[in-house]
Structures are given as C-alpha cells and as structure tokens.
Amino acid sequence: RAVKFEDIPMSQKRTMFNVLSEGKAALEDEFAVDFDDDVISALTDHASGRVRGRYLYGATDANWNATHATALTNIDGTNDMLSTAMIGVAKRKALIPVNATAKIRPARFKMGKDSEQWFTLWAHTFALRDMVNSDAAWRNRELNLTPTGSNSVLFNGSAFKGAWEGVLVYENERLPLVASTIQVTENLLLGAQAAAVVWGQRTKFNEEEADFAHDVSYELHEIRGIEKLVFSRATEEDNGVVHVFSAAVAD
C-alpha cells in the first residue's frame, strides 16, 4: 500500500494536524486491516480440510451435510443463535476428535514467566448480540468473569467479551456473512497452529520525496503468504480451527 501527499506546504496550512504523521498512521492502519482480512480469508476457506469433526452448523451436529451449502440451509434464526452451549460443543469437537482424526491443542500464551493455555473464539457482532440477548448463562456475571491476570493485553480492549469454559471470546465484525435460508455467519474457534504466515520479505517502510520535498510518498511493502493449516491424513482436516456457523440476522 502507498499514499502520496502533494503540495505539502499548502496542505499543512489548511489543517490543524501534521499531514505527514497522520498519513503515515493511516497507512499503517490500512495495512493492518489488509492483514486481518487475509487471515480471515485463509481461515474461512472451505476448499480443503472440511470434515464433520471440524464444523458445527448451528446448535446441533445433526445439521451437518456433506455439501456445505446444504448444511447452511439447516440453520434457523431461532434455535441456532450463538450460545454458550454452542461454544461448549465446538470446544469438545476440538478436544475429543469424533469424525476427525486428531485433537486441536489450545494455544499457549506467555504471561511473564508463566504461561496459560486457551482456545479463542472470534465471533461476529450479530452472533454476539444474539448470545448477549438470549443466553442467560452468558449474562450471568458470576460465570463470565475476566480470567486471572486481567492486566494482560489478552483480556483488555473492546473486542474482548469474556471467557467461557477455557475459551476467550472476541468480537470480530469482519467475519463473513453468508446469505442462505437466513443470513448466517462463520465464527471461528481457534487452537494452536490454525494458520501460518510466511514472509519472503518482512514489512518495509519506504519514503520518497519529489518537487524539492513539496511532494512526499509513503509505502509499506512486504512479500508474504497466509494459509490455513490442513493436516494431510487419510482425509485432510483443518489442523487448528472449528468452524461455528450461527444465525446472524441483521438488526
């Protein structure tokens, strides 16, 4: 990504902020958005690794169908809203491989000299809305306490919504929405080694001046690839993600 500023002396006179500093920050923000979108695109790729033990369509495993589009039609707007029960089912799919070969390990997070193991759930804004409004267990603050060590960056910020049965729950409005019988979303329960990011060239920042520094261009550049990890067993299966589809009807 790149951005160019022209006639900086005049542009600076028309603003109350530093044009170059704000432009550089905006470029970095857009670069981060691109990275996030690429991670989500990789994790939500169903072309490989799709087995019943890594997918949950709504509240019950019985909604599974070998054809992905058909399975989506089994999700309804009443019984298949995201819930703590669905989070529990997804976690058990990860830990106890039924219709899959291997378990999914939780990710290990370093906390100073110690470490903790957690699964994480990225949930769409509409899915979280349904769980907050409809699931009494989630609303029970005695059960939905912030984990020990709440000063960690893992448990802060507006995206972090709480923890349930060893699963850290985060809001992610960029998860895909899919039109089916109703609108549904793909929430992601993630363990260790769900995806890989590989760089051929690490991120570099470049600056170029022209017209005696009246014009300035900034560029962020990298060579990288992001892919969901799929283990090649007798049947290929996703290595570290359970796909949790739920209702996501718009307001």
Model-based region annotation:
Residues 62-106, 118-122, 126-251:
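Sequence/fold signature of self-assembling virion shell proteins
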Residues 1-64, 111-125, 210-223:
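Long, contiguous amphipathic alpha-helices that act as assembly "spine/axial" helices in icosahedral shell
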